[in-house]
Amino acid sequence: MKCIKCGNMEDKVIDSRPIKEGKSIRRRRECLRCGYRFTTYEEVQEIELFVKKRNGSIEQFDRNKLMIGIQKALEKRPITQSQIEDFVDQIIEECSAEKSPIIPSFVIGTKVMNKLKTIDEVAFIRFASVYCKFHDAKDFMNVISELKMNEGPSKSVPMLLQASSK
């Protein structure tokens, strides 16, 4: 690392600590020429994600938009804000692990619905009603009956997505 005082490229690391829950590293360095001490930070460069919408358009992934949708589904449910933020982080991590930085919106929606179904069925139904564009009470009843019949989270979600695309 180049010394900001003398420009020398040689230094030694005096101290190194993980910060931000292990997502960054803070290093205290000392220039081997002039002895000046300085701090550097290292972070993993995250892949920029994009969302391919149902109409074919592509837009930059918006964490806040995902957060708002999940918060609305979980409104007045026994889930803390910290749990919601962890939930959103998990969805983003799963999306970042995909092969392409362009994620179809239905993939994100499916991930959200699968996770919601395991933590809060009411929130799952709320989210599904908006995401799958329910038209009437019959749509709600169909999802509720599927929830009762299917134990695994992934069983009814693909059926919902197929029904919503008709």
From Swiss-Prot:
A zinc finger (unnamed) spans 3-34. It comes from the Bacteria. Its cofactor is Zn(2+). Keywords: ATP-binding, DNA-binding, Metal-binding, Nucleotide-binding, Repressor, Transcription, Transcription regulation, Zinc, Zinc-finger. InterPro entries: ATP-cone_dom, NrdR-like_N, RNR_NrdR-like. One of its GO terms (biological process) is negative regulation of DNA-templated transcription. Residues 49-139 form the ATP-cone domain. GO terms for molecular function: ATP binding; DNA binding; zinc ion binding. Binds 1 zinc ion. Belongs to the NrdR family. Negatively regulates transcription of bacterial ribonucleotide reductase nrd genes and operons by binding to NrdR-boxes. This is Transcriptional repressor NrdR. The lineage of its organism: Bacteria, Pseudomonadati, Verrucomicrobiota, Methylacidiphilae, Methylacidiphilales. The gene is nrdR.
